[in-house]
């Protein structure tokens, strides 16, 4: 993916990481081999939870379904992501709150700050709101979903891994997640 993007003229690639209440991002990027890849290809990484990154209040063009109720003080997103193309790199796996996790759930980790777990009771509506935000702030959205190993069980952390050797790719976040769900045995409709 990196070499192809660079051949096509995308030379300002950046790895984006956000904080989580459960996993140390610096440990995760090493254990998941992300750091190896970014180092090998000279891709700089941005850590959105570091103080130098500004989070700005986002005002949607149309009313939110739920985010304004979960965050009555305002919905804040990373300023650095506004106006940037985005390539999500999710994995094929199940999720204890959302059934599966994929491209749309990947935005959950990037666009919402540390208290994003507050949205779990309304997660499906939250994902719709996040897709709306993405479509408004990113000129291009693409996902390459890694199914070389797919996980099932009470994910995303307590997984049973299965070798499946598939890759999915799409500019349609709903479609790629629907295909992933179907491949995992769930009815996406």
Task: Please place each PLM-identified region on the residue numbering.
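N-terminal and secondary-structure boundary signal
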Residues: 1-189
């Amino acid at each position: 993916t990196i070499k192809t993007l660079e051949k096509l003229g995308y030379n300002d690639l950046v790895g984006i990481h956000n904080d989580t209440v459960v996993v140390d991002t610096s440990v995760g990027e090493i254990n998941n081999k992300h750091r190896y890849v970014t180092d090998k290809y000279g891709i700089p990484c941005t850590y959105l939870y570091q103080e130098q990154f500004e989070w700005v209040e986002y005002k949607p063009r149309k009313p939110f379904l739920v985010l304004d109720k979960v965050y009555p003080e305002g919905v804040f997103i990373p300023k650095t992501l506004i106006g940037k193309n985005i390539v999500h790199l999710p994995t094929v796996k199940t999720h204890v709150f959302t059934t599966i996790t994929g491209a749309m759930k990947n935005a959950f980790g990037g666009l919402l700050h540390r208290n994003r777990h507050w949205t779990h009771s309304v997660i499906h509506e939250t994902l719709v709101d996040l897709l709306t935000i993405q479509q408004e702030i990113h000129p291009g959205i693409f996902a390459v979903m890694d199914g070389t190993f797919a996980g099932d069980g009470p994910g995303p952390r307590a997984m049973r891994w299965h070798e499946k050797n598939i890759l999915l790719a799409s500019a349609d976040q709903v479609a790629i997640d629907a295909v992933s769900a179907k491949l995992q045995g769930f009815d996406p409709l």
